[in-house]
Each structure stands twice: as structure tokens, then as C-alpha cells.
């Protein structure tokens, strides 16, 4: 069924940098109270960074605030410790552990709790009192289902690019996106958390040396879906000035719906709540324990996303984009060249898929996520992607290409076109580098997989501390880290990724130019336009011909 969740998780986890040897950490005074953070040092940089962890931006969403819009955090007395990561929002920790192993990571995740609406701030320590630095506001990925702020250490990016990095958490899964479509549970709770966190930045970021008038929202996978959604929401107007979405866009799959009760009934079933009335259903869910929701999540992976509620979202994403009635800000967006290469098919493809597949197996997986609304459409798509396949390995490669295109690449390219045609400056990339640390973990056919770009954006080459990536980066990859931090830092500062010492990144205009991000960067043109044309034009023609026979 269409409601089956594809866990578009973000899988690159982060690391804490080593605390600098100082007697006491930095103190910042906010209107809600004071915070004591810690100084951290960054490999390869002379700058120290102030790190503030677990800052509350909302009241705990528990009791009557469960399945409700978030409320701003309340003031606290005294000096609040800001040196520990907050608990993760409710999720299945077994999934995070499994993903970590696949990604060659070694770290101990924190506990999970409904009381999870916190954010982390990383800011360069050596700055003048009058200096206001641009802000990158990062939203984690994980299919709107898993993940958390602990996965990202913003200190390397903050030090190298002299920017303020904010990493937030938001409610996930059932508690983040459940909706009955009426006044009892309008939904979009996780997106509303993101809006409140942006409002917190507007009110508080100057205390950390940040500029509230220069905020870039950024994210990957579900984080990219989120930043894309925020450009469509009237609630986010004036809260940010540039946007980055990596391997995710608002049009991806069925991430926005006008009919949330289809999914609400599935939730009612796994939580054992009466769905005969929406009032009874929501009342029952507010009485459930945290463990009840974790058990429900383990029982069935439920797709939940944005609901057209008339408040956060006025219409489904595609219709808003077509109308051009959205926030026109500079956009940087892109994909990897093998989005469905390894991590995602490990979950959804049949056993032994990596050795080779047949057409029947391809059709079975595709049918899980794309049930045929028009007879014959899936066969036509499979025909296109397998037309040159001669061996089981060829079929496997066509399968991974097809699923990557349908789930991520084509939606991102379409959204890029909508923003460009509405008058926004757009910069597109394809990340093509296969990280060295996966050379002995992944099969040789896997190229740049989903989320492989994120570590380079955050300077993973220079991570050190309690959370480790098992493997090594080459000297060429160290330079790629610096290059990508440079591009992202420039965009956060100016709305353009270009700057001294970097290969020119062309705008994504009517000529469809983009940048190939490899050890050596090059300009490209017409990314996947042949497949976009097939899916938008040729497929309809073939279906018409099929009906005529």
C-alpha cells in the first residue's frame, strides 16, 4: 500500500570534538536564563568553538501538549548546564544501531524521550562583540521517523567557515505527524516544532554572535523534505533567507496528503485505539505510554508526513509549487549518483539482491511503494530501466537506478525547476564520490550512496572524539571536505556557493547546468533530464497507446 514507509534516514552520524583545556566553559545569557557551554578545539583550525548542547526551545510536548502545537520554552532560574546532548525523540533505537553498523560508525546513542525539543548551537569563540555571523539551521534526516541532533557536530563547519551552526530536534513518527484531519489532531507537529525552533533563532541567536537576518535552513533526506516544506508554509515567512535541501524534496512520495485518516486508522490499529470517532482516537492516544508508541513503531513501519491543514500547509506540495505561491529565496540542492545504492535496498530489496535480480523481484519491490493506479504503468517504467539489461547484475543495477530516480532524484530535479521558474536563484549538484572508508564494506558496484555527501558538508575528515567513523579519509578527501564546507559556507553567507579558490558553480537556469562534486569538481548539464522526460512525457504517450490497443 502507498502508506508503506520508506525510511529515508540520514545515516551519517557525527562526533563530539574534544573539549579545550579550560577551567570553565563559556556563558551566554538569554531572555529565558543563562547557559554554560564548553569550548572545543577543531582539528586543523586555530579557532576554538563554543558548544552549547540541549537548549530547550519548547515546553516538553507531554500530557495535554502531546499531539498539539508546541509552546515556547519557559524561563529557568540559575545557570543551566549545556554540555550534554539531549535525549532523542521517541524512535526505535534498534534501527539507529543497525544503520550505524552499516555506516561503519561506533557511538552510544542517548536515551529516548517525549521531552526532546532541544537544539544545539556551535559558534566561533574568537569573534568581536559587534560581529554578527550568518547562521546555518540544520534539520536532521531519518524519514521523519528516526534521528537526532547527536548525529551532527557543527563545530568543524563553524570553525572553518566562521558561521553559527544550529542543529535541532523535532517530534518524529506517530507523535510528530499523526493527524485526524480535524480540530482534534490537525497534524504537522514535527513541522510546527521546526517553525518554533526558527522563531527561537530569531529571538536568541544574536546572543551567540549570530545574525537573525541571515539564516539558511538546511537538511538531508527527511531534513531536505522539511526545508523544502518550510519554503511552502506561510508560517515560515520571514524566519529564513536561504535554503538547502539534499536528497529530499517536498514532492517526494506521498509526504503531503489531504486524507490523513487513511493513515490514522492504521495508527489506531497498531496502538489499539478506537477509531470510531476522531475525538475518542486522540483521547486514547494521549493516554498511551512512551513504551506503547515505541512498541507500535516496532510493530509496523507507518508512513506519516505532512497534512494539508490550512495552517502550516495550504495545499499538497506539488500544487503549491505549480502556483508559485511560496517563499522565493536562493536554493542549493542536489542528490548523490546512487541514492538507492546500498543502505535503502538492504531494507527493502529481497535477500541476495546485491548478487543479482530478476524482473519479477524488481516488480515486487516496486509494487510495494508504487501500487498501480493506472494499469500497466509499472511495467512500462521497468521496461525503460531494464531495456539494456542482459544479466542478473544488469537487472540489479537498473533496479537501483530506477528506485533512486523515482524516490529522490526526479522529485529533487522537479522541485529545482519549480523554484527556478518562480524566479529564485538555484544551484544544483550531483555528489559522485565513493568515500574511501566504505571500500571494504560495500560492494564495488555501489557508487555515492544516500547521505554520503553529508559527512563532507560537516567536515567529517576532521572529526575526533567519542563518536568514531571506522575507517580513514584520504588526503584528497580531506581537501574535498574543505571544498564542500567552502561551497556551503559561501552559500550560507551570500546565497551563492561561489568564492575564491573554488571551481565555478553555475546557476541552474534554463540551460540546466549543475556541479559534479567529486575529488575534482566539474560543471555538468541536463542531470537526468532524459529520465525526467520519459516519466513526464513518454510514459503518458505509451499509456495512451496501450489503452488504444
Where are these regions (language model features)?
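Short, solvent-exposed turn/loop segments enriched in Gly/Ser/Thr/Pro and often Arg
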Residues: 218-222, 430-438, 503-512
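Surface-exposed helix-capping loop/turn segments at secondary-structure junctions
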Residues: 123-133, 205-214, 274-278, 393, ...
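Serine-hydrolase-like catalytic core of hydrolytic proteins
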Residues: 2-14, 106-278, 282, 311, ...
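Non-catalytic accessory segments of hydrolases
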Residues: 2-6, 11-191, 212, 359, ...
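Non-transmembrane alpha-helical segments in soluble domains
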Residues: 136, 195-198, 202, 228-231, ...
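A structural signal for well-ordered alpha-helical segments within the folded catalytic domains
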Residues: 50, 114-117, 192-195, 199, ...
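Substrate-gating cap/lid region and adjacent catalytic-acid/histidine neighborhood
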Residues: 250, 284-475, 487
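Extracellular structured ligand-interaction cores
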Residues: 52, 114-118, 134, 328-329, ...
Amino acid at each position: 500500500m502507498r502508506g508503506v514507509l520508506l525510511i529515508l534516514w540520514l545515516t551519517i552520524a557525527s562526533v563530539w570534538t574534544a573539549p579545550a583545556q579550560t577551567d570553565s566553559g563559556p556563558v551566554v545569557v538569554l531572555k529565558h536564563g543563562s547557559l554554560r557551554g564548553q569550548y572545543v578545539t577543531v582539528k586543523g583550525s586555530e579557532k576554538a568553538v563554543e558548544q552549547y548542547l540541549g537548549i530547550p526551545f519548547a515546553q516538553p510536548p507531554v500530557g495535554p501538549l502531546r499531539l498539539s502545537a508546541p509552546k515556547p520554552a519557559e524561563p529557568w532560574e540559575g545557570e543551566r548546564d549545556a554540555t550534554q546532548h539531549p535525549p532523542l525523540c521517541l524512535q526505535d533505537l534498534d534501527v539507529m544501531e543497525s544503520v550505524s553498523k552499516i555506516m561503519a560508525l561506533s557511538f552510544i546513542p542517548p536515551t529516548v524521550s517525549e521531552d526532546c525539543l532541544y537544539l544545539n548551537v556551535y559558534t566561533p569563540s574568537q569573534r568581536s562583540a559587534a560581529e554578527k555571523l550568518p547562521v546555518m539551521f540544520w534539520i536532521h534526516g531519518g524519514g521523519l521517523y528516526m534521528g537526532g541532533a547527536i548525529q551532527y557536530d557543527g563545530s568543524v563547519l563553524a570553525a572553518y567557515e566562521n558561521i553559527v551552526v544550529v542543529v535541532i530536534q523535532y517530534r518524529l513518527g506517530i507523535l510528530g505527524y499523526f493527524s485526524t484531519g480535524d480540530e482534534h489532531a490537525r497534524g504537522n507537529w514535527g513541522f510546527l516544532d521546526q517553525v518554533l525552533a526558527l522563531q527561537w533563532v530569531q529571538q536568541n541567536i544574536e546572543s551567540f554572535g549570530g545574525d537573525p537576518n541571515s539564516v539558511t535552513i538546511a537538511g538531508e533526506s527527511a531534513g531536505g523534505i522539511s526545508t523544502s516544506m518550510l519554503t511552502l508554509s506561510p508560517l515560515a515567512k520571514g524566519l529564513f533567507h536561504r535554503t538547502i535541501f539534499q536528497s529530499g524534496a517536498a514532492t517526494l512520495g506521498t509526504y503531503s496528503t489531504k486524507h490523513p485518516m487513511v493513515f490514522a486508522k492504521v495508527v489506531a490499529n497498531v496502538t489499539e485505539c478506537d477509531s470510531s470517532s476522531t475525538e475518542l482516537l486522540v483521547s486514547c492516544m494521549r493516554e498511551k505510554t512512551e513504551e506503547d508508541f515505541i512498541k507500535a513503531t516496532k510493530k509496523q513501519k507507518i508512513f506519516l508526513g505532512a497534512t494539508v491543514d490550512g495552517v502550516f500547509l495550504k495545499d499538497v506540495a506539488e500544487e503549491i509549487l505549480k502556483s508559485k505561491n511560496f517563499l522565493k529565496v536562493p536554493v542549493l540542492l542536489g542528490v548523490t549518483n546512487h541514492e538507492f545504492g546500498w543502505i535503502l535496498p538492504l531494507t527493502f530489496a529481497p535477500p541476495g539482491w546485491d548478487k543479482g535480480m530478476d524482473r519479477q523481484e524488481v516488480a515486487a519491490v516496486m509494487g510495494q511503494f508504487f501500487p498501480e493506479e493506472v494499469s500497466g504503468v509499472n511495467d512500462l517504467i521497468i521496461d525503460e530501466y531494464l531495456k539494456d539489461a542482459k544479466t542478473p547484475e544488469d537487472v540489479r543495477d537498473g533496479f537501483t537506478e530506477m528506485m533512486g530516480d523515482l524516490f529522490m532524484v526526479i522529485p529533487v530535479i522537479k522541485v529545482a525547476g519549480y523554484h527556478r521558474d518562480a524566479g529564485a536563484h538555484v544551484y544544483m549538484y550531483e555528489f559522485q564520490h565513493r568515500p574511501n572508508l566504505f571500500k571494504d564494506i560495500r560492494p564495488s558496484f555501489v557508487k555515492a550512496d544516500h547521505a554520503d555527501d553529508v559527512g563532507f558538508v560537516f567536515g567529517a575528515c576532521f572529526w575526533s572524539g567519542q563518536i568514531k567513523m571506522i575507517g580513514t579519509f584520504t588526503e584528497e578527501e580531506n581537501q574535498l571536505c574543505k571544498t564542500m564546507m567552502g561551497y556551503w559556507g559561501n552559500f550560507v553567507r551570500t546565497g551563492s556557493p561561489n568564492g575564491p579558490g573554488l571551481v565555478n558553480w553555475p546557476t541552474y537556469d534554463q540551460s540546466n547546468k549543475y556541479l559534479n562534486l567529486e575529488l575534482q569538481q566539474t560543471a555538468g548539464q541536463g542531470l537526468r533530464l532524459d529520465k525526467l522526460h520519459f516519466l513526464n512525457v513518454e510514459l503518458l504517450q505509451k499509456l495512451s497507446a496501450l489503452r488504444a490497443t
